[in-house]
């Protein structure tokens, strides 16, 4: 990692659209409603053993917040929020409890990693879930066209190895897409236009933070 400070913000995925760049080329972008986030706690090396800031985002009915969590928000002097996430940072001097963060934490051209929950697909077979080829369509193949085939020997090893790719529930996993560029920051409307696709459904929670690979360039 470089000495460049890590930045991050929570937001909501609004969907995809396309815009034109300075050379009149079409650029596919994902629109993220970034923030506003509020800093509710600061972790320090001396007290907690690591440096991080705790960010809160999203409206919630105060009656749905339990007492310990409500007390934490009260101590920070902010109203309760729906989502709370910690962001590891090397230096917490730029943050203070109660501080509000908006889309302006990033600049045009910054490289970011985006984390979200992928779309749930339900129970899926091996061809859809793992990309298996399947079995032959003819030449004696009977009613097993989409079956996975053997999952292990009968006597040796006499068991199914851990990690065997099989049918099961697909999606709803935590996914991170790395090294995406911020095409444009719309500070007035609190929007980030991120080049390319990001994980999750429309309206889903996403975490946008400085790219890890190659050091933070934002």
Swiss-Prot record:
Region feature Disordered, mapped onto this chain: 132-152
Protein name in UniProt: Large ribosomal subunit protein uL3
Protein family (similarity comment): Belongs to the universal ribosomal protein uL3 family.
The entry's keywords: Ribonucleoprotein, Ribosomal protein, RNA-binding, rRNA-binding
Organism: Rhodococcus erythropolis (strain PR4 / NBRC 100887)
Domain of life from the UniProt record: Bacteria
NCBIfam families: L3_bact (TIGR03625)
A single GO cellular-component term on record: cytosolic large ribosomal subunit
UniProt-recorded Gene Ontology molecular function terms: rRNA binding; structural constituent of ribosome
GO biological process: translation
InterPro entries xrefs: Ribosomal_uL3, Ribosomal_uL3_bac/org-type, Ribosomal_uL3_CS, Transl_B-barrel_sf
Gene3D superfamilies, per the entry: 3.30.160.810, Translation factors (2.40.30.10)
Subunit structure, as described in the record: Part of the 50S ribosomal subunit. Forms a cluster with proteins L14 and L19.
Pfam families named in the record: Ribosomal_L3
Function: One of the primary rRNA binding proteins, it binds directly near the 3'-end of the 23S rRNA, where it nucleates assembly of the 50S subunit.
